[in-house]
Design a protein with these regions (language model features):
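A charged, aromatic-enriched C-terminal amphipathic alpha-helix characteristic of glycosyltransferases
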Residues: 15, 337-369
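N-terminal strand-loop element at the rim of the active site
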Residues: 6-14, 18-73, 77, 237-239, ...
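A conserved mid-protein helix/loop that constitutes part of the nucleotide-sugar donor-binding site
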Residues: 14-22, 197, 201-220, 237-243
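Active-site donor-binding acidic/aromatic loop of nucleotide-activated sugar
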Residues: 230, 238-241, 252-261, 267
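Acidic anion/phosphate-binding donor-loop and adjacent secondary structure
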Residues: 65-69, 154-158, 169-190, 195, ...
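Short hydrophobic beta-strand element within catalytic cores of glycosyltransferases
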Residues: 296-301, 306
């Protein structure tokens, strides 16, 4: 059995965390084991399930919290366990911190994978500077260069490393996300939404995801359709700001902050539209899960990669059109039916986003020398 040390799990059950869990559920765990390096001493998302699937988790102090402790604990971990791992796989949205790869090289791990999950800087200006600096040197420390999309590859790589880039699809378990009418009815009944138009968004409450604009769009839509609600599933730094803005717009009774939810299938099933006005994305797992559920999706044009579109009831729309135009498009999209699961399953397989077929490809890449 080969063991791979994986970095990318945090306390927040976001897109990268879902991506890693999906693949670990479906690789042949008799051939390969994932161990997870977590830069927090708190439990990370899905940790109990990962452990139940045979993974190990190693917790160290984050560099941001204490750089000296981070460096010491990282070296101690590799000194103790480095000989067990045939590869290190680093899943990140920025190259600001490449110490994991440097340390892996120092301890003789031959296969060192960097995997890009974003297409723009989501962090501070300083981390943006560090990203562009490390972009020049990443070829010195990594041996394999992966990305979730062509845009994400260009954000991380240049020249020779870009030519070597391999696109790894953010494949999902399509059956696990399929529309469930019983779960739809249960959630809508529990919240008193039986006769309401439910517009939803799933993701980290963060500048990148542009939920503030979603509130502006919903304000326009709600004026014309008062029997509607906007639901945010997720948590993040912007939650208080968004809650205050909803109040200022007079929408407190019509905007729901559902927090972290583990049955995403049920929440997607309760939606009539998935509203996704992100400012930038790598290749959104949330948008893929929404399409597996069949719910109509309205997403940012020129921001979210074209390859995200699987279903016919997925529409791109330019953010520059403004909230009123988005509101009219929202009204149009809510009149469109869900896609049938048979068609969805076939399209996901054809485009390489069905985890049942993609997990074997990833396993082969991880095990290749």
């Amino acid at each position: 059995m080969q063991k791979v040390l994986v970095f990318g799990m945090t306390e927040n059950p976001g897109g990268v965390e879902s991506f890693l869990l999906n693949y670990y559920r479906h690789v042949n765990r008799e051939n390969i084991q994932f161990d997870f390096l977590c830069n927090t001493h708190q439990k990370v998302a899905y940790e109990d399930e990962l452990l139940s699937l045979g993974a190990h988790t190693f917790h160290i102090t984050s560099r941001r919290q204490n750089p000296a402790a981070f460096k010491r604990e990282l070296n101690e971990l590799f000194a103790l366990h480095g000989g067990e791992w045939s590869a290190v796989w680093v899943n990140v949205s920025s190259l600001a911190n490449i110490e994991y790869l440097k340390t892996a090289k120092q301890y003789g791990i031959k296969k060192r994978i960097i995997h890009s999950h974003s297409s723009q800087n989501m962090d501070s200006r300083l981390r943006g500077v560090l990203h562009h600096l490390n972009k020049r040197f990443i070829g010195k420390y990594a041996t394999d260069f992966w990305a979730c999309s062509e845009d994400a590859a260009r954000w991380f790589y240049t020249g020779k490393t870009l030519k070597k880039a391999v696109i790894i699809h953010n494949a999902i378990d399509v059956e696990r996300m399929a529309f469930d009418p019983a779960k739809r009815d249960a959630i809508r009944k529990a919240h008193g939404w039986e006769n309401k138009h439910v517009i939803g968004n799933v993701g980290r409450l963060h500048f990148e995801k542009n939920q503030s604009f979603a509130l502006d769009v919903f304000k326009c839509y709600h004026t014309e359709h008062p029997n509607s609600v906007l639901v945010f599933v997720g948590q993040g730094e912007d939650e208080q700001m968004l809650s205050e803005k909803a109040g200022a717009l007079g929408l407190s009774d019509s905007v729901v902050f559902a927090g972290v939810q583990h049955d995403i299938q049920a929440w997607l099933s309760s939606f009539d539209l998935f509203l996704f006005p992100s400012r930038f994305e790598g290749l959104s797992v949330s948008a893929m899960e929404a399409q597996a559920n069949g719910v109509p999706v309205l997403a940012s044009k020129g921001v979210i990669p074209d390859e995200v579109k699987i279903n016919e009831n997925f529409a791109f729309f330019d953010l520059d059109r403004g909230e009123e135009a988005w509101s009219h498009k929202t009204e149009e999209m809510t009149r469109i039916d869900r896609e049938s699961f048979t068609v969805i399953k076939r399209r996901f397989q054809e485009k390489g986003f069905d985890i049942q077929t993609e997990a074997g490809k990833l396993e082969a890449l991880l095990c290749a020398q």
